[in-house]
Amino acid sequence: MHELSVTQGLVDMLVEEAEKRKVKKVTKVTVVIGELTGIESESVKFYFDILTENTVAEGAELVFKIVRAQFKCTQCGNVFERSNFTFKCPVCGGQGVLIDKRGKEFYIESIEVE
């Protein structure tokens, strides 16, 4: 349910920036979401469509780029992306630890305007 609040923040930022730059219409917004944020892109899209009504971003295309988290095995050193909700190394079965905080992103990558 936190998608509503993060989407509200995203829309507020988007509209504020558009007003500063005297943009008449936002046509496309690309958002980066890390897989570990727990943010569901479908929910963001749902709230985005509602929250942008009667704004410069109404009807804008919303595109998502999902960033996969990478883990490193504590036993064999293998670097891998998790699958099937497990943090076990696919090579040796050891425990993986998160590398470089990848997968925790949530930000606007780009905005296209008319």
From Swiss-Prot:
Zn(2+) binds at C73, C76, C89, C92. It comes from the Bacteria. This is Hydrogenase maturation factor HypA. The keyword Zinc applies. The keyword Metal-binding applies. Ni(2+) binds at H2. Coiled coil: none annotated. It comes from Caldanaerobacter subterraneus subsp. tengcongensis (strain DSM 15242 / JCM 11007 / NBRC 100824 / MB4) (Thermoanaerobacter tengcongensis). Keywords: Metal-binding, Nickel, Zinc. One of its GO terms (biological process) is protein modification process. Belongs to the HypA/HybF family.
